[in-house]
Amino acid sequence: MAIPILDALTSSSGKKNSAEFSIHSTSNPTNPEEPNITSEADNAEDLAALGYKQEFQRGLSLFSVFSVSFSLLGLLPSVATTLPYSIGYTGTPGLLWGWLIAMVFIICIALSMAELCSAMPTSGGLYYAAAVLAPEGWGPLAAWFTGWSNYIAQLVGGPSINYSTAAMLLGAVNIGNPNYEVQNYQLFLVSIAIQFIHFILASMPTKYIAKLNSVGTYLNTLFLFISMIVILAMSSKNHGFNETSKVWSHIENYTDWPDGFAILMSFCGVIWTMSGYDAPFHMSEETANASVNAPRGIILTAAIGGIMGWVMQIVIAYTVVDQTAVVTGSDSMWATYLSQCLPKRAALGILSLTIVSSFLMGQSNLIASSRIAYSYARDGVLPYSEWVATVNPITKTPIRAVFVNFVIGVLILFLAFAGAITIGAVFSVTAIAAFTAFVAPVAMRVFFVKDADFRTGPFNLGKFSKPIGFCSVSFVALMIPILCFPSVKNPTPAEMNWTCLVFGAPMLAVLIWYAISGRKWFKGPRINLASEGDNSTLEGVELYTGSEELPQKKEKE
């Protein structure tokens, strides 16, 4: 139940009563606008009030957790990968206006997510929030739907990034040796090799992960600026820049749909690029002062990523020589674009920087996705949850969850042998699955929970919470069907957009699983709702009374 749950969360049994302690408010009593810098014990106590014991080391600072999510955006490789959407539908106006308009709503989603993260800083993230905020009787189903949508996005996102990295790596070989032809098995093997390296890196102790991702953030930012400077300098020297009026207003519609609808379709590029800024939410149990730093990480990632990404789009729009050749060419759009505006060696150099950034992006994805797997397994959602939900006593990281995601990623990569259409359809699901999960708990907050009954954390939107949340939900509700449209009205199988099938089929499968079996044993996240002398169980969640043993999934009835 949404309202009683929110009240009960602030009166958990233990050392402090509800008048003294609330997990949803850690403001400084002398200055309510200035949050306290909480201690390790305070972080653990906040987490215990959410129903979980502290198992990770809180070794991530604000910059560290921002580094994970910013690296996961991978602006340089993401912009390169999404050119078929951003410029491939409406030309340069799609690059510029598409990114700018969509970012307004993406920032709204980030703000709404950050507010929930501040109130409920747990690795379960969106899945946990959906259960707590859902109306009476719907908590378990809301958590199940949100959790699986988010997990599917993460599972598919990692292999898609690594496959793109492998394709760019072998494409660089092709630039050096034009007679070289890339084979599917080579893409598969290189992708697996990259994924295995990520498995090793994501299993390291948190302090090393923090350092690695900090370095990754610096490199991603540096490489992005180097790429923009080189492209601008070479273009200015060789062929000049495109006219401003043409760049901003001359629509080259490469679809069968009206210009306005085609611009909306171009939003796919920025939506795919920005589908990783929820990572701080899932890393909150490893973050110091999580109710403050994790939401800040979400907002910083969305804002800085959005601005820097748009600047990169402006650079491309003003320097592309022949956008029709880029869109209709048989080679990679990014490679074609670079070859137009740069000499061969410079193009190869920028492509190399893109490959390194893409590698770091994939590594961040596995870190975030493994924490999601761990949090879901801890609540009994995944098969063999008892085995998966284990933190290695030496590294203090969920190595088994990392391994599970690595294996599933390898299985997904086998689809590369089925051809470009199949593997492309699988990978296109990342954006729609991620943003469906992003707004599910926001919708619960907007439509089912009154402001007076929602106890905010140090970061909150105040009276703007519901208006911003409504904008977030409306945007995603509009974009979901648009992202499923093909670019032509009468598509062949090769031209069809299979996103609706690739996302719909597994989601339908997990919903059927819930109807047949899951509803009998899955009661939502296990949270500590009982105050002293009160053993009542609230619907929509499963009571966990603080046993030292890890809660296990109930036996199937």
UniProtKB/Swiss-Prot annotation:
It is a multi-pass membrane protein. GO terms for cellular component: cytoplasm; membrane. InterPro entries: AA/rel_permease1. Pfam families: AA_permease_2. GO terms for biological process: amino acid transmembrane transport; gamma-aminobutyric acid transport. The chain crosses the membrane at residues 60-80, 94-114, 214-234, 261-281, 297-317, 348-368, 407-427, 468-488, 498-518. It is found in: Membrane. Keywords: Amino-acid transport, Membrane, Transmembrane, Transmembrane helix, Transport. This is Uncharacterized amino-acid permease C74.04. One of its GO terms (molecular function) is amino acid transmembrane transporter activity. Residues 17-38 are annotated as: Disordered. Belongs to the amino acid-polyamine-organocation (APC) superfamily.
